Amino acid sequence: MPVWLQVDGKPVSCLEKIKVLNENLEEIRAMIADAVEDGVLMGCDPAQIRAVFHKLVEAAAADAPPAKREE
């Protein structure tokens, strides 16, 4: 699992936040693995599947609210 960083570059220290982030990451990983497997079984090009998912992540990141700094 990654070391989750705050906007200032310091590691997130709250264990509950880290737990939620890691759980979210694992859920997304499992969902992506299932979707890739489905696509491949249906005859889709794995490279195209990766490209589509990459664009999806880029779009989600672009739509994310700006990071807030702790005061």
What do the predicted segments below correspond to?
Residues 68-71:
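Short acidic DE-rich linear segments
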